[in-house]
Every structure is written in C-alpha cells, then in structure tokens.
Design a protein with these regions (language model features):
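Short glycine-rich or small-residue beta-strand-to-loop segments that form or flank ligand, phosphate
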Residues: 139-145
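Nucleic-acid enzyme cleavage-core boundary/entry regions
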Residues: 1-138, 151-179
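Acidic, divalent-metal-coordinating active-site segment for phosphoryl/phosphodiester hydrolysis
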Residues: 147-149
Length: 179
C-alpha cells in the first residue's frame, strides 16, 4: 500500500514489473527479514488474493495504480469490431484465435486458465483508450473445456468484464458435447 501511495504522489515511478517480481522485490524480502516467511502457507497466493480483494471487492485500488505489467498482453488483441470477443481457456489456442481475429477484425483473448483480474483490467483499459463504447452489446464466443472448470473460467471472465463496465454481454459457447 505504501508503494502505491508513493507512486500516486509521484515520489516513485510506476513499478512496470509483474506481480511475481513485486513479490520477490518487496514482499518476500520484508517477510524474510521479519522472520515471517512460511513454508506451510503459499504467501504469494495470499498476496494475489489480497490484491484481488483490494481491487475487485473493496475497490480500493486498480492494478495500474502501481504499474504492474500484464504478463498476458501478448495473448490478447483488440479488433475493429471490439465488441465481438473470441476467448479461450488455453494459451495453446492463441494461433487459432489470432487467425480468426485477423480474418474478421474481432477481439481475442487466450486466458491461460483462470482469468486474471489484472489482465481484464488492462484489456478493458485498451478498449477505453481506443474509444470503444463499453455500454454497447458485447458478443463473447467461448472456447473452454466442456466441464465444470471450463464453465467456471468462462463465468469468471464474464464477471471480470462486468466489473470493468462491460455489462451487456451475450455468451456463445463454441464447445458442445455433440461436436
């Protein structure tokens, strides 16, 4: 929190690093010096959970406040038809997504598993910067596993989009058991 405050007051430059780098640069050394590193608890996962809480639940901050870098930036594309989004659970679908996105000038995102609130924040920020009207209807075409995990990933992505102002969505699942 102190780093965020210093960045916002322009006393320090934005971090421009990954969350994991933030953990290794600031949090882990501090816990180590305090004798508070735990081998029983995944404290990095706790950090991520706490930051997500501060961003999404308590709405105290945004990832861009600190300047975290989006490690999934290369796996998303904003198309001219930005309100049509083809997304997949797996990074391995990135080439397919890119081909379709280029052919039809649509947006695409390969999530790489459970979607990151940070990734969605920056994706929607890119839309805002491009002048995309977030109040219009968005059509989301999902390529996720036809199982509970896939549906959780799909629903989490849609929920994150809604959190960032994209609330008029229609989801079309492209994976069905009869395929």
């Amino acid at each position: 929190w102190q780093l965020r405050e210093r960045i916002l007051k322009k006393e320090k430059p934005p971090l421009r690093e990954l969350l994991r780098t933030f953990w290794y640069m600031y949090i882990k050394p501090t816990l180590s010096r305090a004798g508070a590193l735990s081998s029983d608890t995944d404290q990095y996962a706790q950090l991520i959970s706490n930051i997500v809480f501060m961003v999404k639940d308590a709405e105290l901050m945004e990832y861009k406040d600190i300047g975290f870098r989006d490690d999934n930036q290369a796996n998303r594309r904003l198309g001219g038809n930005a309100n049509i989004i083809l997304f997949s659970e797996k990074l391995g679908h990135q080439d397919f997504l890119s081909d379709i996105a280029n052919k039809y000038n649509i947006s695409s995102v390969a999530l790489g598993g459970q979607p990151s609130v940070l990734n969605v924040e920056y994706f929607v920020d890119t839309m805002r910067a491009a002048g995309v009207n977030l109040k219009r209807s968005f059509y989301l075409f999902s390529i996720v596993d036809y199982d509970t995990s896939g549906w959780i990933i799909r629903d989490a992505f849609v929920d994150d989009l809604r959190f960032y102002g994209i609330s008029h969505t229609q989801v079309i699942d492209l994976i069905h058991p009869d395929m």
